[in-house]
Amino acid sequence: MIEFIRQLFLDLYEVAPRWNFIFFHDKTQWDRVAEGFWVTIELSVACVIFSVIIGVVGAWLQGSHLRLVRNIVQGYIQFFRNTPPFVQLLFFYFALGQFTPTYSPDGWLEVPIISNVGWAIISLSFFAGAFNVEIFRAGIEAVPDSTQEASEALGMSRLQTYIYVVFPLAFRVSLPALNNNLVNLIKTTTQALAIAVPELLYQFLSIWNDYPSALYPSLTMVFIIYIGLVGILVYSMHRWEKAMRIPGYGQ
């Protein structure tokens, strides 16, 4: 079957030279695509997890009794929401990256302790996290004050009320908006190619650069793969949203 597919795309290339699906009949190029796919998955999963954590913590800190803490969180939100994620990525990697400590694995080459993949995760997580803070804040405000007052009457601390009462309800209310933000985050990971992160788009552009006849196939495959990835995420989030829905909240 694999040999049949390989021969099929070789024949297509002979008939239509501008449609060279080289990654289907050249194992080396296929390996590059597979590597890019897994880097994209790893980058996306890491950014989703960290951005949600940032959103949860930031939303809680927004309710702090200390004005300084609230101002710091608000400043963070304004900075990351009002500057392009591409500029943020370059700032983290080139501006802050020069201060990163290095180590020498072989006693000769100096390597920064935070790689380009690490900086991409940090930058994109902070970017998406700023939106998640506002999403979770809106969810928290949707929880009736009487619910919080009841938990406090039971002797719960502010942190316990947030963890066990407010956040579970707020999370359910926030899921639709969170879904949209995470979809945008997955699409934004393609910008990591600017700092040479070998994700999916980077690998396809490299193949196109090495084999100009693979231009149309490369862009077509990127388009199809991202439709699939985003489609799976949207479907999963919608299923999760329905499973966690509570009558009377977020409807």
For each feature predicted by the language model, list its residue ranges.
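Transmembrane alpha-helices and adjacent helix-loop boundaries
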Residues: 1-251
